Swiss-Prot record:
It comes from Mesocricetus auratus. Glycans are attached at residue 77. Pfam families: adh_short (PF00106). Belongs to the short-chain dehydrogenases/reductases (SDR) family. GO terms for biological process: steroid metabolic process. It comes from the Eukaryota. Homotetramer. The gene is BDH1. Keywords: Acetylation, Allosteric enzyme, Glycoprotein, Lipid metabolism, Membrane, Mitochondrion, Mitochondrion inner membrane, NAD, Oxidoreductase, Phosphoprotein. Substrate binds at residue 59. Gene3D superfamilies: NAD(P)-binding Rossmann-like Domain. This is D-beta-hydroxybutyrate dehydrogenase, mitochondrial. Its main location: mitochondrion.
Length: 132
């Protein structure tokens, strides 16, 4: 069995469907709660007593507002790895490449277009182009 959290859309949704098509029993967490609730606590809270291996999906974009929780997944995984090692539980983190289209993250152009004028004044357009 596999637990996949954050299955409302994006990578989690695609991963859950793919694993199901490969014959896995998938527990798909599709809760419309705060991102931190899904990405941090939903990863293992309910299933930890049953697990021998934990594989968390994080993000290479660990420095944007969306990914502050993904960086939290990495820190949480590091702590969990240390704490669960004596019990033989393995903990891994997978950081997929750029899945911006699948995650519905905005392009730099769209972010700039939707910014309030007061924010544009203090953050020039060049600031958003580094996100490419």
């Amino acid at each position: 069995a596999v637990l996949v959290t954050g299955c409302d859309s994006g990578f989690g949704f695609s991963l859950a469907k793919h694993l199901h098509s490969k014959g896995f029993l998938v527990f798909a967490g599709c809760l419309l709660k705060e991102v931190a609730e899904v990405n941090l606590w939903g990863t293992v809270r309910s299933f930890l007593p049953l697990l021998r291996r934990v594989v968390n999906i994080s993000s290479m974009l660990g420095r944007s507002p969306y990914c502050i929780t993904k960086f939290g997944v990495e820190a949480f995984s590091d702590c969990l790895r240390y704490e669960m090692h004596p019990l033989g539980v393995k903990v891994s983190v997978v950081e997929p490449g750029n899945f911006i289209a699948a995650t519905s993250l905005y392009s730099p152009e769209r972010m700039w277009d939707e910014l309030p004028e007061v924010v544009r004044k203090y953050h020039p357009m060049d600031y958003y182009w580094w996100l490419r």
